[in-house]
C-alpha cells in the first residue's frame, strides 16, 4: 500500500477566529487541531504532533509514514522502534512501518508550562488535587494549564457534548485560577473503527506535542494503582500501559508522564467526598449532549455510585450528580458483572465491598457463576480453533 504522507503543518483561522494547525494528507482529509487565538502562544513550530497522531493509523493499514516539517530526532527514533513494539504487543494485527520526516532536529529547551487534561472524571480530579490544589508542590511540577481535548471521547455526542462538558467545568478552573484551554481536532476521523480506549494514549499525547511552544510537562491520569499497571489484553485499553508508553512519547523538551498510580480508583473516588468540587464530577459515557446529570446506569456511573454507596457517601451526590432510580434498577445485574470480572479495578471494588460487609446477594452470585462459565467456554472454543 502507498505511503501515508502528511505535509508540513500550517496555521489558519476558522470561522470563529480560532487558530487551526493543519497538515494536509495525500488522498485523505487534512488532520487539524485548533485553539483559541488567546492560546496561540502555546503552539509549537514542529510536526511532532502529526507524527504521534498518525503513527497508529499508519501501522494499522501497513503504510509507511512520511511527515512534512521538522520532527524532534529522539521522538522519531522511538516512533520507529520501541513504541511500535509496544503497540504491536497490544494490537498484533498492526504492522511495522517506517516513519520519516522532511527534517529532524534535537529538542530545544523545555518550556516552563505544566499541563494536565481535565474532564471532570475521578482520575483527572486526582491529578488536579495532587499537582494543582495541594500545598507544597514544587514549582517545576505544579500545574499551570488545564486542557480539555476533543479527540474522540464523546461518542455520538461529538463536538456539542464536548463543549457542554467543557463549559460545565469552567468554574473549577476559575476557582483554581488556572487557564482552561479547549483543544478541538478532527483526529477521530483519522481513526476509523480503531476504538477510542485502544488508541487514547496517542490521541492525547498528540495534543501536548501540539502545545510544545509553551508546555514542557504533561500529566495524564493513570487508570489504576501501580499493582494494576500491565500490558493490556489483545486489542484492549492501551491506557493500562500508560506508565510504559508515556516515557516513550516524551522528548528532552517535553516530559509526558502518567500520574496518580499511588492511589487506587476507590481512594480517588472517596477523596472527592466532602470536597468543594464534588458537584462537578462527570464520569458518564452517555453521549447525549442534553443530559444534565450522569446517566447513573452506564458501567462508569455504576462503578462510581457503588463505591460511594459502600462507603456510605452516595447521598452526598444524589440527586445533583447522580440519580438513584436507574442505578437501583441495574444494581443486581451490575453485581453479577463485577463478581465475574477479571478487570483489576473491578476486583478491587469487590474486595472493598467484601471488607465492608457488603451483601452481593444470591441472585447476583448465581448470575456471576453463569457468566464465568460462559466466558470459560468461549476461551476453550477459541483455543481449539
Task: State where each predicted segment sits.
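Nucleotide-activated chemistry modules centered on ATP-dependent adenylation/adenylyltransferase
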Residues: 1-9, 14-24, 53, 58-65, ...
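N-terminal, positively charged, Ser/Thr/Ala/Gly-biased leader segments
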Residues: 25-44
Amino acid at each position: 500500500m502507498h505511503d501515508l504522507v502528511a505535509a508540513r503543518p500550517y496555521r489558519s483561522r476558522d470561522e470563529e477566529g480560532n487558530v487551526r494547525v493543519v497538515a494536509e494528507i495525500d488522498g485523505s482529509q487534512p488532520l487539524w487541531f485548533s485553539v483559541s487565538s488567546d492560546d496561540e502562544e502555546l503552539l509549537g513550530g514542529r510536526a511532532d504532533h502529526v507524527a504521534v497522531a498518525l503513527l497508529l493509523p499508519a501501522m494499522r493499514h501497513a503504510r509507511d509514514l512520511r511527515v512534512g516539517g521538522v520532527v524532534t530526532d529522539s521522538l522519531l527514533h522511538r516512533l520507529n522502534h520501541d513504541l511500535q513494539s509496544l503497540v504491536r504487543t497490544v494490537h498484533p494485527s498492526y504492522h511495522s512501518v517506517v516513519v520519516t520526516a522532511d527534517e529532524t532536529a534535537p529538542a530545544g529547551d523545555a518550556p516552563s508550562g505544566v499541563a494536565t487534561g481535565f474532564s471532570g472524571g475521578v482520575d483527572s480530579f486526582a491529578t488536579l488535587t495532587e499537582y494543582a490544589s495541594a500545598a507544597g508542590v514544587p514549582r517545576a511540577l505544579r500545574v499551570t494549564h488545564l486542557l480539555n481535548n476533543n479527540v474522540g471521547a464523546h461518542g455520538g455526542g461529538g463536538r456539542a457534548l464536548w463543549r457542554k462538558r467543557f463549559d460545565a467545568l469552567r468554574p473549577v478552573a476559575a476557582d483554581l485560577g488556572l487557564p482552561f484551554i479547549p483543544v478541538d481536532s478532527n483526529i477521530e476521523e483519522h481513526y476509523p473503527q480503531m476504538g477510542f480506549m485502544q488508541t487514547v494514549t496517542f490521541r492525547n499525547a498528540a495534543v501536548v506535542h501540539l502545545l510544545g511552544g509553551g508546555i514542557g510537562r504533561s500529566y495524564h491520569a493513570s487508570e489504576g494503582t501501580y499493582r494494576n499497571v500491565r500490558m493490556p489484553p489483545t486489542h484492549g485499553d492501551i491506557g493500562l500501559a500508560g506508565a510504559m508508553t508515556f516515557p516513550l512519547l516524551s522528548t528532552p523538551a517535553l516530559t509526558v508522564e502518567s500520574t496518580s498510580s499511588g492511589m487506587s480508583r476507590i481512594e480517588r473516588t472517596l477523596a472527592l467526598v466532602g470536597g468543594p468540587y464534588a458537584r462537578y464530577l462527570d464520569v458518564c459515557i452517555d453521549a447525549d449532549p442534553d443530559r444534565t446529570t450522569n446517566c447513573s446506569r452506564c458501567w462508569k456511573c455504576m462503578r462510581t455510585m457503588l463505591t460511594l454507596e459502600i462507603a456510605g457517601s452516595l447521598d452526598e451526590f444524589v440527586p445533583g450528580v447522580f440519580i438513584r432510580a436507574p442505578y437501583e434498577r441495574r444494581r443486581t445485574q451490575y453485581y453479577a458483572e463485577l463478581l465475574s470480572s477479571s478487570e483489576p479495578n473491578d476486583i478491587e471494588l469487590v474486595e472493598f465491598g467484601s471488607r465492608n460487609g457488603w451483601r452481593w446477594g444470591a441472585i447476583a452470585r448465581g448470575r456471576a457463576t453463569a457468566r464465568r462459565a460462559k466466558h470459560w467456554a468461549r476461551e476453550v472454543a477459541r483455543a481449539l480453533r
